[in-house]
Amino acid sequence: MKTLRHIWFPLLLLLAVFTAPAQAARLVIMIGENEYRTWETLPEFAKNDITPHGHHVTIIQADEADKNHFPGLIEALRNADLLLVSVRRRTPRREQLDSIRAHVAAGKPVIGIRTASHAFALTPKAVISDPSLGVWPEFDAQVLGGHYTGHYGRDAATIAVTPGRESHPILSGIAVKKLIGHGGLYKNTPLEKTATLLLTGTIPGQITEPVAWTHHHGAKPGRVFYTSLGHADDFKVPDFRRLLLNAIAWALHP
C-alpha cells in the first residue's frame, strides 16, 4: 500500500451525477481506518468517478508502520480545494493535525464519511503517551456538525429523505431506496443546530438517526458534508457513489 499516490486522468466525460458542470479542483483524500476497506474503495472511487471530471486527487494513506503518521498530508493540503476524510481514532502528529485545522480555518470544504465522526478522538480510557501526537475530539461537532456516540451493531438501516429536503442538490438523481447502510446505523443524535439534515436511518426498535447532513464551519464558513454510510458494500451501490459526487460538487461551488 503506497502512502502517497497522485491520480490524474484527463477530462473524458461529464456524468449526470454532478448537479452542475464543475471546474477542475484539487482534492485530498485522507485514509486511516482498518474496518471498512476505504483504503481500497476510495482510491477506486477517485479513479473511476472523480478524476473523469478533470479533478486532481491526492490519496494520503496512514503509514503501514505507524498508523498515526500520514506522510505527505501537510504538503498536499497546502493547495487543496477540498479534504475528504475517512479516518478512525487516529492521533496524527501535531503539525499534521494543524494542517487540517488550517484547511478548515481557511473556509475550505470538508467531506467526511463513516468513521470520520471519530477520526481524531480516542476511546474514553485511551491516553496519548507521545507528546508529538495530537487529538481533536471536537472535530465531529465543530466541523462536521455531528454527535457520534456509538452504533447499533451490524443491522442494515432503512434510509429516508428528510421531509422538505427532496430538492437539495446533493440528493439530485439519487434513488434513496437503493441506499441500505450496510455497516450498521451510527448514533449521531443530536446534530448541531447549524447542521441541515438530509437523510435519516431507522432500524427496528430504535430511534431514527441522522445519516447524512450538511454543515458550515469556521470564521470563514466552509461547506461540509458528512454521511455515516461508507461501508465497502455501500460503494457497490451507484447511488451512494453519486451521493458523494453530488456532495463534492456542492461543496466546491457555494
Give the predicted meaning of each segment.
Residues M1-H6:
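Positively charged n-region of N-terminal signal peptides that target proteins for export
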Residues W8-T19:
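Bacterial N-terminal signal peptides
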Residues A24-R26, I31, T41, N48, ...:
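Extracellular ligand-binding/catalytic regions of CAZymes and related secreted enzymes
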Residues R26-I29, N34-A119:
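Helical hinge/lid and interdomain linker segments adjacent to catalytic or ligand-binding clefts
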Residues M30, R89-P169:
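A glycine-rich, often tryptophan-bearing local segment used as a flexible ligand/cofactor-contacting loop or short
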Residues T51, H56, N79, G146-K220:
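Catalytic beta-strand/loop cores that center a nucleophilic Ser/Cys/Thr
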Residues I59, V110, L197, V224-Y226:
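Conserved beta-strand scaffold positions in the cores of enzyme catalytic domains, especially
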Residues V135, F139-L144, Y148, K178-A195, ...:
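Oxidoreductase and adenylate-handling cofactor-binding alpha/beta cores
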